[in-house]
């Protein structure tokens, strides 16, 4: 019986991986064509808005397939490239990439970091973790708000915090935000392009690197994600 279950789970994982991989190319084509069409000055404002909606949803689908593929690969016990990483530098790169998105809501992102923030890790996954945390802070942050990223060394650990002054999370939802596809506000998630996988992936990445993460939040005040990794 257990062998049949394991076979079934393996087939499910393989199916998820295959579907996610096959979706990437057509979704990329849709994104490319939408961006091309939006450059056409002869389109009406109504046409451009409709194309923009398609583009937003296509980008959301692209993010979803990428995250599903990453999760499927993890469940297949794929090897990860562990190397010496400068966590501070990687965080700077993520913040730089997300500045345009933050500016759309006039959100200021500040980074406060100590030196010597080195750890062993998979660079792609650590970048994804920080991307998800800061993107989440932007999506649920208030217009004209602030996001503070704080990185320090404490007891041979890298301690990081991503703190926003956004809408916050009610206590009833705090324990469930790590679940796959769990969304507190589905309409807001769709509007922001959320997939429901971001925080689930964050926790998996943290656990993979022998770290810990927890969340502190007060409704209408803001949210802080605090994580720790072994330092080298």
Placement of each model-derived feature along the sequence:
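Short beta-strand/loop element within the Bergerat-fold HATPase_c
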Residues: 144-156
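Conserved glycine-rich
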Residues: 210-211
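Conserved micro-motifs of the catalytic ATP-binding
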Residues: 43, 76-83, 118-121
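Short alpha-helical segment of the dimerization/phosphotransfer core of two-component systems
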Residues: 53-61
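Conserved catalytic submotifs in the C-terminal HATPase_c
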Residues: 83-84, 103, 108-118
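Short conserved segment of the HATPase_c
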Residues: 169-183
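Short helix-loop "hinge" at the ATP-lid/N-box region of the Bergerat-fold HATPase_c
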Residues: 137-138
